[in-house]
C-alpha cells in the first residue's frame, strides 16, 4: 500500500511538471521549455506591463522576449498560440519579430508563486502568458494576449489552411468581404470556426447551420459584437465586447459584409 501511495504521488508530480511545460514548434522540430528553464534564461527579466488586458491593471512579470524563442522563424510566417481551454490565437510572426514598437514577452509564472486568479473560481493566467509593452504601436488587439498557453506552432496562413473560410476569389482585394475576412482572422477565429473549419473550440460556428447575420437584425448584430451581454446573458458567457478602440466601425461593417457574403457560401463539414 505504501508503494502504491508513493507511486501515485510521483505520477501526480510528473503530471504537474508536464502541465508547466511549453511546447514550441517552429517547423523544424519541437522544443519543450519548462518553467525552470525559461526563468533561468539569461535574457529573462522583470518587466512592468501597464494596462494588462487580462488583469485590467498594471502588472509586473518575470518574462522572456518572445522572439528569442522563435529562432529562424521568418517575419512572414504565422503563429498559433493554443491555450489549455482550446482558445487559439492566430498572430502574424511579423508582429512579434518586428512589432514596429510593440514588444512581445512571454511571462512565466514561477513555481510556488502563483499569480492571482483571473476571477472568482478561475485559475491564473499562467503558467505562460503572452504580454505586450507598447501594444498600441503594433497595433495589438486583446485577442493577441493569449494566456494559459500550452503550445506555440508555426503554421501556414489561415487562408491556406482553411479554404472554406475564404470569400469568393473573384472579389477584389479591397472588397468589403475580403477586408472583413482579415477582421475575422484577427478577432473572431480565436474562438469561432466557420464552415466547420478552424482550430478554436470555444464559440459556435459562425456559418453552420446559420450565420448570425441571417437571424439578427443589423442593429442586433452590432450589439452582439459591441456589448454581447446586452443581447444575451448567461453565467458561462465568455465573449468580450469589442469597442471602437479595438474594432473600428469600418472594421465592423467589413466583418458584417464578410459574414453576409459567407452565408451564401456554406460548406457542410
Please place each PLM-identified region on the residue numbering.
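Bacterial N-terminal signal peptides
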Residues: 5-13
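Periplasmic c-type cytochrome electron-transfer domains
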Residues: 117-167, 213, 218-220, 242-260
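Axial heme c-ligation environment in periplasmic c-type cytochrome domains
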Residues: 91, 201-207, 227-256, 262, ...
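The canonical Cys-X-X-Cys-His
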Residues: 180-195, 221, 239, 255-259
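Gly/Gly-Pro-rich "capping" loops immediately C-terminal to redox-active cysteine motifs
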Residues: 193-226
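Structured, non-membrane catalytic/scaffold regions adjacent to prosthetic-group chemistry
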Residues: 20-156, 269
